[in-house]
Amino acid sequence: MVNKNAIILAAGKGTRMKSKLHKVLHQVCGKTMVEHVLTQLQAADIQNIVTVVGYGADTVKDALGDQVRYALQKQQLGTGHAVMQTEDLLGELAGQTLVVSGDTPLFTAATFNHLFQYHEQRHAAVTILTSKAPDPTGYGRIVRNEIGIVERIVEQKDASVEEQAIHEINTGVYCFDNQKLFAALKRLTNDNAQGEYYLTDVIGILKEEGEIVTAYQMEDFDESMGVNDRSALAKATKIMQKRINTQLMKDGVTLVDPETAYIDTDVQIGQDTVIEGNVVIKGRTTIGADCLIGAGSRIEDSTLHDDVTIMSSTLERSEVHSGADVGPNSHLRPEAELGENVHVGNFCEVKKAYIGAGTKVGHLSYIGDATLGKNINVGCGVVFVNYDGTNKLHTNVGDHAFIGSNSNIVAPVNIAADSFVAAGSTITDSTEQFDMAIARARQVNKPGYAKKLPW
């Protein structure tokens, strides 16, 4: 089996992005561009991957971790110079090496595999990945002879009128015979106006040496899109989102309006779940089967089991078990967990709390730092008072308890199972089973006193 290597070029600054963030670390559908490239290389069964870093090297290393090895390009002197920096790691190896830019998030593993296969079948020294561009302006053109053999790559500024009419373009991805690549790099010079070492010049060197130079033309031009500015980032995101949404629909998920379903790459959604319009689902969210995610919802890094309904609400790092429903207009903050058939109605907030099966929190309530048992009724306007100005404190509520509307539960307390908290109470002491707790001033009516008031 032929050894397969890859080099990811990720050293450039990307000034056109106008950003403090290194270009390849901008995200497309929840994953950085360079991570998209790495994921597809790994899916193509390429395990020996070197990333060339330079500007923002530490941040790129933080993003990719130990999944790859790194070569440092201290000065950005061109793509050929970048590949030279990998010689200590790759120079002595046999096999094939794919070179790809870290700002091309749309390439797929299938395309990489086809490129490798084409290259190997033709025993080439280098195979250029090409595509047909609807508008080739700005791209290097692939010039072939009368029998289709690649003669050269000509850049836009150097192209004749006839060459400018060519629609086959260089995508900037190459598959090299590894040893021939590094041998040719030793002959590479920077004798050009920019004083840089161009990887495309290696192709000319190999051609001069009589090596086989081929080009594999892929079908989907969109894959080759490089991202250099915010406009291109938005376009790449739209293309990626369409891919994600199309696959979800093929897998049995209903997207009412695919154009406004913003779903990240790593999200998983079960069959017969319905996603309405203007929904954002981010991070490593998993949604089960037969769920309904209502319009205007935002869900991030959360787990929803089967048959869950979320209406116009926000969930962050939360878990919702089967049969539960949330919203409209509620917020599950990190470490919220709802048991089976829990109802959290409108304008509620739950944070770092477990709510047991069958419990109902109807409206306008805050539950934080608490554990609630099963089949509890939490009335309107109940507040779990969890912060004393220094510490967050915990409250427990037992099964079948009833908490009346407009009550304050001041932590730390334990509301026992089957106990009853009267409406309007401020509870500061724990209760025993079957207690009724009432903590409010007795009402006093003063006859005729309202006439004396200034309103």
From Swiss-Prot:
One of its GO terms (molecular function) is UDP-N-acetylglucosamine diphosphorylase activity. InterPro entries: Bifunctional_GlmU, GlmU-like, GlmU_C_LbH, Hexapep, NTP_transferase_dom, Nucleotide-diphossugar_trans, Trimer_LpxA-like_sf. Mg(2+) binds at residues 103, 228. Pathway: Nucleotide-sugar biosynthesis; UDP-N-acetyl-alpha-D-glucosamine biosynthesis; N-acetyl-alpha-D-glucosamine 1-phosphate from alpha-D-glucosamine 6-phosphate (route II): step 2/2; Nucleotide-sugar biosynthesis; UDP-N-acetyl-alpha-D-glucosamine biosynthesis; UDP-N-acetyl-alpha-D-glucosamine from N-acetyl-alpha-D-glucosamine 1-phosphate: step 1/1; Bacterial outer membrane biogenesis; LPS lipid A biosynthesis. Residues 231-251 are annotated as: Linker. Binds 1 Mg(2+) ion per subunit. Residues 252-455 are annotated as: N-acetyltransferase. SUPFAM superfamilies: Nucleotide-diphospho-sugar transferases (SSF53448), Trimeric LpxA-like enzymes (SSF51161). Pfam families: Hexapep, Hexapep_2, NTP_transferase. Its EC number is 2.7.7.23, 2.3.1.157. Its cofactor is Mg(2+). Residues 1-230 are annotated as: Pyrophosphorylase. The keyword Nucleotidyltransferase applies. One of its GO terms (cellular component) is membrane. UDP-N-acetyl-alpha-D-glucosamine binds at residues 9-12, 23, 73, 78-79, 101-103, 140, 155, 170, 228, 333, 351, 366, 377. Keywords: Acyltransferase, Cell shape, Cell wall biogenesis/degradation, Cytoplasm, Magnesium, Metal-binding, Multifunctional enzyme, Nucleotidyltransferase, Peptidoglycan synthesis, Repeat, Transferase. It is found in: Cytoplasm. It catalyses: alpha-D-glucosamine 1-phosphate + acetyl-CoA = N-acetyl-alpha-D-glucosamine 1-phosphate + CoA + H(+); N-acetyl-alpha-D-glucosamine 1-phosphate + UTP + H(+) = UDP-N-acetyl-alpha-D-glucosamine + diphosphate. The keyword Magnesium applies. One of its GO terms (biological process) is cell morphogenesis. Acetyl-CoA binds at residues 386-387, 405, 423, 440. The active site is at 363 (proton acceptor). Homotrimer. In the N-terminal section; belongs to the N-acetylglucosamine-1-phosphate uridyltransferase family. In the C-terminal section; belongs to the transferase hexapeptide repeat family. Catalyzes the last two sequential reactions in the de novo biosynthetic pathway for UDP-N-acetylglucosamine (UDP-GlcNAc). The C-terminal domain catalyzes the transfer of acetyl group from acetyl coenzyme A to glucosamine-1-phosphate (GlcN-1-P) to produce N-acetylglucosamine-1-phosphate (GlcNAc-1-P), which is converted into UDP-GlcNAc by the transfer of uridine 5-monophosphate (from uridine 5-triphosphate), a reaction catalyzed by the N-terminal domain. This is Bifunctional protein GlmU. It comes from Limosilactobacillus fermentum (strain NBRC 3956 / LMG 18251). The gene is glmU.
